[in-house]
Amino acid sequence: MAPKSKKVAPSPFAQPKAAKTTKNPLFVSRPRSFGIGQDIQPKRDLSRFVKWPEYIRLQRRRKILNLRLKVPPAIAQFQKTLDKNTATQVFKLLNKYRPETAAEKKQRLVAEAEAVANGKSAQDVSKKPYNVKYGLNHVVALIEAKKAKLVLIASDVDPIELVVFLPALCKKMGVPYAIVKNKARLGTVIHQKTAAVLAVTEVREEDKNELASIVSAVDANFSAKYDESRRKWGGGIMGGKTQALLAKRAKAAAATVRL
């Protein structure tokens, strides 16, 4: 027969009693349940579940495809754009040479007509205009004639085939060129929604030094690196899940080789 368990004698020392915490009656506990049909869910980012418009879905798919697929060098070079500081300088200069608006043109023609009526020539009233040149065919003709001093190409032209040949043409003709980020930003210079390409042919005497510094910065980024960009393919970047899977496979393959 198993021996009976003996009871341990209680400690002769007094046990310290835990002090009771008094709760403030003003703060009432209201536990919530976030099950289906229960309390209102906390606010969280639900953008993943939004049904976005078709054009947004298309541009997102296009971006993913450009990352995933192997992109030929001629198209991949449009992913490398002019840096922010130089682009700010360029647009600051371009804004001085914006084409005249309809109101400005009317004002100029009225002033010229009054001058002619008073026996003067039109050139006495209006100075020689210095404007940014735009229009794809016009700019191509200026590049071929080597009249363009700086060419700006938008990186997001659709279809890209419209401008894909321009970097090669500029390099062949020795014309400085730069790929800038936004066709809409180029469009604002010429009072239009978008512009694929702009060219600077002439500037005033006071802006020649600024243009020269911009051209030297642009040449270092694009013309000097043209041969490198001509050989460099783009894309081929997989998503996070695929990269993790490939890393896992590589790790397993390395472990089997070690064995």
Swiss-Prot record:
UniProt modified residues of type Phosphoserine: 11, 33
Swiss-Prot/TrEMBL keywords: Cytoplasm, Phosphoprotein, Ribonucleoprotein, Ribosomal protein
GO BP annotations, alphabetical order: cytoplasmic translation; maturation of LSU-rRNA
Superkingdom of origin: Eukaryota
Keyword Transmembrane helix: no
A GO cellular-component term linked to this record: cytosolic large ribosomal subunit
Annotated spans, Disordered: 1-24
Summary of subunit composition and partner proteins: Component of the large ribosomal subunit (LSU). Mature yeast ribosomes consist of a small (40S) and a large (60S) subunit. The 40S small subunit contains 1 molecule of ribosomal RNA (18S rRNA) and at least 33 different proteins. The large 60S subunit contains 3 rRNA molecules (25S, 5.8S and 5S rRNA) and at least 46 different proteins.
Protein name: Large ribosomal subunit protein eL8
Function recorded in the entry: Component of the ribosome, a large ribonucleoprotein complex responsible for the synthesis of proteins in the cell. The small ribosomal subunit (SSU) binds messenger RNAs (mRNAs) and translates the encoded message by selecting cognate aminoacyl-transfer RNA (tRNA) molecules. The large subunit (LSU) contains the ribosomal catalytic site termed the peptidyl transferase center (PTC), which catalyzes the formation of peptide bonds, thereby polymerizing the amino acids delivered by tRNAs into a polypeptide chain.
Family: Belongs to the eukaryotic ribosomal protein eL8 family.
Record's subcellular location: Cytoplasm
InterPro entries associated with the record: eL8/uL1-like, Ribosomal_eL30-like_sf, Ribosomal_eL8-like_CS, Ribosomal_eL8/eL30/eS12/Gad45, Ribosomal_eL8/Nhp2, Ribosomal_eL8_euk
GO MF entries: RNA binding; structural constituent of ribosome
